[in-house]
Amino acid sequence: MEEKGNYTPIFNTAFTDKNEFPFTDGWLMNADENLKCLDLPKAKAITLNKVSDSELQKQQFVQSFNADIETMEGAALHYVCLQEHIPFLQIRSISNHVGERDKTKWKIKEAIENLNKELQILINDLTN
């Protein structure tokens, strides 16, 4: 929750507890043992309903959550799949740094190409 320019985690309010299912210590964890065999780098992500556009916001999120990346829909996928006991995997390709508003510096084409490459490798590994 954002209030007066500061971010307050929902767990610091009376809305929910950080260990209420499907949360584990405030995180939506994918503990699927089948994922351990995949040779993919892991990242800690936070999901926001906005685009972070300042260095102050970026630092607040890094300090509060030690997050590697920011998404706008990742938590919804995790939440629903955990609630419904549906196996899932979220693969991300990074196009820009948090807070970078100059879209000419974003590398969307390269990010999509890298994602497609990794998906082809993953599909090949899973089907062979």
Residue ranges and their predicted role:
Residues 1-65:
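Mid-sequence, gly/pro-rich, charge-dense loop/helix-turn segments that line enzyme active sites
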Residues 21-26, 92-94, 115-120:
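A general structural signal for short secondary-structure boundary/capping elements
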Residues 1-5, 66, 70, 111-115:
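Gly/Ser/Thr-rich active-site loops/lids in small-molecule metabolic enzymes
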Residues 50-99:
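A C-terminal functional module that forms or caps the active site or interfaces directly
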Residues 98-128:
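His/Asp/Glu-rich mid-to-C-terminal helical/loop segments that flank catalytic regions of hydrolases
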Residues 36-39, 80-86, 121-125:
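A structural motif corresponding to the C-terminal end of an alpha-helix
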Residues 45, 94, 111-113:
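Juxtamembrane helix-loop transition sites at the ends of transmembrane segments
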